[in-house]
A protein has these predicted regions:
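Beta-propeller domains with acidic blade repeats across secreted/periplasmic ectodomains
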Residues: 257-504
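Short structured motifs
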Residues: 139, 162-167, 229-235, 303-305
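Beta-strand-rich N-terminal accessory domains
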Residues: 1-176, 189-198, 202-211
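Aromatic-residue-lined binding/catalytic grooves and analogous aromatic/hydrophobic interfacial grooves
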Residues: 18, 68, 242-244, 460
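N-terminal pre-domain segments of enzymes
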Residues: 1-49, 251-301
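Short, well-ordered beta-strand segments enriched in hydrophobic/aromatic residues
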Residues: 177-185
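Long, charge-rich, low-complexity alpha-helical segments
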Residues: 185-187, 194-196, 228, 248-251
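Extended acidic/polar, glycine-enriched regions
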Residues: 210-280
């Protein structure tokens, strides 16, 4: 991203054509994804030359980007020339219906990386529509770890844990993408589809046209094969120990990498998941304002938000939660979480420290057993700070939805915790692809089960909890029901918006 001087405006005007040179510069940076520091990894939908309802998009540096669909862990593409085009999105405009766009130059065959169903590449992947997330006995996204310039993705495939970290290398005129892998022990064989299109395999390398793949491994039994349906497949054998290997991929029509070998990138990724170095070293100090009137039903102090900050973050505050020690966590619509300290009886020195970035619209947070927990689009995320340095080290996918929605207006609202430890949040039905017409979702305390306890909600932009544990909600705008009503929901309730008459 590019830093602006102190005179810059950080909110894009609605009419950029007449907004001056500064706004035009911001528009250009938004179109290539470098207006703001989003962290090295961002969760969002992706459209354009790569498509996903819920993707993890990783900045590899040198204007090179890779993106994974989190429902299948399939790569939807690697591209050069930018990160994502945010110009028509809520990352850049006050109100916008656009989605992050991968409109850049996609590397040929960079979207073939996918795990085989039931461990065999010849197996046909079943149609799971309307779901877009594989069942968890096949694959589960567990979260990701930022570690310096690296992003380490954690997931499980047919019961075996996997750590994967992509890395960029320039070789000749080509871009080489390394997939560094650590696989947990397990008694079942896994198969990873690396490329399509009938490969020519020679030992630990394979070619398809101008595309080349190298396997770097010291593990016996780990090898390439060509499947019956013409795919380049990596066989991963059963093992009693961790398996470390690297798969490097390049596409080069200039043949500048002919007879060259990429650098060895085998790494023990398990050694990088207990906390990395701090990334955001600049804290911001503001001064709050105490309430002055004594003739009010309540007192309202004001905490000043650092609208101008070292990361060009757009501080569209969207959620908050207090820690037991009085610190405040503040989420923003573009995906940041900041920790705010100095909230006391004078507010003379309020300090803002960036804690996390790249979340998908955190619109509700709670501190549960000391861990900051957020509802985002597609999942409930727990943010773990393992080394107590003030930054999240693991973005744990505590609960994954099986129908994440890409609609720009299909929000998940608020987070409440029940007496039994279960979680509740409101999910939009209007402007949504969800097969339920909006509802309150209940997630078990262990994150393994979810149920809808009330449906027929257009945009439930607020939920609450009564002393007896019942859940209240506020819907908006009507849609043939009273606008801005407050309801008490219950299992099997239907609140009138949408097309259902009952919850089956």
């Amino acid at each position: 991203y590019v830093k602006f001087d102190q005179t810059a405006t950080y909110v894009m005007p609605e009419n950029p054509d007449s907004a001056g040179d500064d706004a035009q510069r911001m528009e250009g940076l938004a179109r290539i994804g470098y207006l703001r520091d989003y962290g090295k990894a961002l969760i969002s939908p992706v459209v354009g030359n790569a498509k996903s309802n819920n993707a993890l998009t990783i900045d590899l540096g040198q204007q090179t980007t890779i993106s994974y669909d989190l429902g299948t862990m399939r790569t939807i593409g690697t591209w050069t020339g930018g990160f994502l085009d945010f110009s028509g999105t809520l990352h850049h405009r006050l109100r916008a219906g656009g989605l992050p766009n991968a409109r850049f130059e996609k590397i040929v065959r960079s979207d073939g990386w996918q795990w085989a169903w039931d461990g065999k590449a010849e197996n046909e992947t079943p149609d799971i529509f309307p779901k877009t997330v594989w069942p968890e006995d096949q694959l589960r996204y567990n979260g990701h770890y930022p570690h310096g310039e690296d992003t380490i993705i954690s997931y499980s495939v047919q019961g075996r844990g996997v750590l994967e970290s992509p890395k960029l290398q320039k070789m000749g005129k080509a871009v080489v993408i390394h997939h560094r892998m650590t696989i947990n022990p397990g008694r079942n064989q896994l198969e990873l589809i690396v490329l399509d299109d009938k490969p020519v395999i020679k030992g630990n390398s394979a070619t398809i046209g101008f595309s080349k793949v190298w396997l770097q491994s010291e593990e016996p039994g780990l090898k390439f094969r060509s499947s019956e349906n013409g795919k380049l497949v990596l066989q991963i054998p059963p093992s009693d120990n961790l398996i470390h290997f690297n798969v490097a991929f390049a596409h080069d029509e200039s043949e500048s990498i002919k007879n060259k070998q990429p650098s060895n990138q085998i790494a023990n990724l398990a050694g990088k998941i207990k906390g990395g170095p701090r990334r955001w070293l600049t804290a911001h100090t503001t001064k709050g304002r105490l309430a002055t009137s004594t003739f009010q039903g309540y007192v309202m102090d004001s905490i000043t938000v650092p609208l101008k900050n070292a990361y060009n973050s757009w501080m569209r505050t969207s959620s908050l939660a207090f820690f037991p020690d009085g610190r405040l966590a503040v989420g923003t619509l573009p995906g940041d979480v900041w920790i705010v300290s100095g909230i006391n009886n004078n507010l003379s020195q309020v300090t803002w420290q960036r804690f996390a970035a790249g979340l998908y619209e955190p619109l509700g947070m709670k501190v549960v057993d000391g861990v900051l927990t957020a509802i985002t689009r597609g999942r409930i995320v727990k943010l773990h700070d393992y080394n107590n340095d003030g930054e999240a080290d693991f973005y744990e996918a505590f609960f994954n939805e099986d129908e994440p929605d890409k609609g720009w207006h299909a929000y998940n609202f608020d987070l409440e915790v029940g007496k039994d430890g279960s979680f509740y949040y409101g999910r939009t039905g209007g402007f949504s692809q969800w097969s339920v017409p909006g509802g309150v979702v209940k997630v078990s305390a262990d994150g393994k089960k979810s149920t809808v306890i009330g449906a027929g909600l257009r945009v439930p932009n607020g939920i609450g909890k009564l002393p007896d544990g019942r859940i209240t909600l506020g819907d908006n705008q009507g849609t043939y029901v009273p606008a801005s009503k407050i309801s008490i929901t219950r299992p099997d309730a239907f609140h009138g918006a949408g097309s259902w008459t009952c919850l089956l």
